[in-house]
Amino acid sequence: MVVVLDPGHNGGNAANPSVINKPVPAGRGATKPCNTTGTATNAGYGEHAFNWDVARRVGGELSAKGVRVVFTRDSDTGVGPCVDRRAALGNEAHADAVVSIHADGSEAAGAHGFHVTYSDPPLNSAQGQPSYMLAQALRDGLRKAGFGVSNYLGSDGLAPRSDLAGLNLSTRPAALVECGNMRDAGEAALMSTADGRQRYADAITAAILSYLGD
């Protein structure tokens, strides 16, 4: 089994706007900027760092179960890769599952909770039932671990979208997890601790293994 983990954004993005603002294919005939900086907690803990830490923890747990893990980036100090390249890495690895790890930055009053996104309407067979089942597994795993579903986006923890390049360009089962809202005080506090990030990682790992049939 092969799982591609895609920790969103990167630590060097903010200092390289000319690189990350370059338009790249986003699927459905659209383009998008190569990448973005991501959000942060009000105290300044960056989403890129959260994504990276959680992804590394998930990768370690999956590797211990015999899963081959591929990361779309190898540090939290680089730039990119662009969203189209991230999708290509999953395709090239013939991944059984591609999971993008993110956190949201909504400033809507009271906005909190996680949501999982998949490409809809699907552009290929992998984006159909396989990606939907992966998204469901991630939703169920996070909820089982005690995380609440989003009260501001999607329905029952699922938020299908048609505009995300990494999902649109994937030919493998793919889903994107927004673990919570970094602008919510409670979720920001959890994300800012190693114990909190381990909780997210454990839930995501269990969900992926469930999807893979382990």
Task: Show where each model-derived region lies.
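Alpha/beta-hydrolase fold active-site loops
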Residues: 1-2, 174
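Active-site-proximal loop motif in hydrolases
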Residues: 2, 7-54
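Active-site-proximal helix/loop segments of hydrolytic enzymes
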Residues: 42-214
